[in-house]
Amino acid sequence: MKKQILSIIFTLTFSISFSQLISYEAIWVNEGMEEDYISVEEIWSEVKKQAIADDIQDFWIVFKVQKDATNADDLKKPDYIVMNGFKDEEQRTKQTNWKELAQKVYKGKMSKKKFEKAWEMTPTVRKETRNFLVERLDNTVWNAPDEGQSLNFFFNGFQALNDDYENYEMKFFKDWHEKRTNAGKQAWWEFNKVLSRSKNANQDVTHFTMDILKADTPNYEHPDSSLFTHQMLVKNGVASRKRVIGDEMTMMFAHFE
């Protein structure tokens, strides 16, 4: 499974562009239905694979949010985060009959009765879903892990506190991520702006970042960390934002163009 995930993630550098739109679904699963939820996503995995082949969307990823069972704040977090990527607004708003597509995918592979039962299960496994639509503003170049090296996924939501925030991310913090990437610590960083959200979603978050770090690598210290100018940039950059969402995740399913 690990090798399969790594082979999939290698394609990120080719499949992700600056102009991409991404929908986030933060999902809370009904108690006792975790295995059913995984079964549902396994069904959808083949459907999404076909959707990507049919140019309905660019990518689909399901992440499981890691939680500390002894931490009350962690227990409030979603159980899963699903990401659907699109080339542009035209692709995102393309009308799709998902049931017809699923029937096409499973024709000859699953009986009609079994298909209907699986299809009807989809809405029952979710207790709550909160949605965001974001636009990719910037990212680093993909730095593939070594064979067998695992990856750690960190998903952060920030509230911009002043008009300088986006510049700090793209003109200062990005350089930091690039240096960590060149040093072999980091595989990927992306910066996304919230365009819209559901009414039940967090109303404070304005931007999201995704950091993908390589496991079992030494900590990286910026070469300018002792300089006063660098320290002031860090201080003011941090002051331009407030982190309101912070999740560490494990990738469960993924398909890319």
Protein language model features and the residues they cover:
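Short S/T/G/P-rich N-terminal loop/turn motif that feeds into the first structured element of a domain
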Residues: 19-106, 110, 114-257
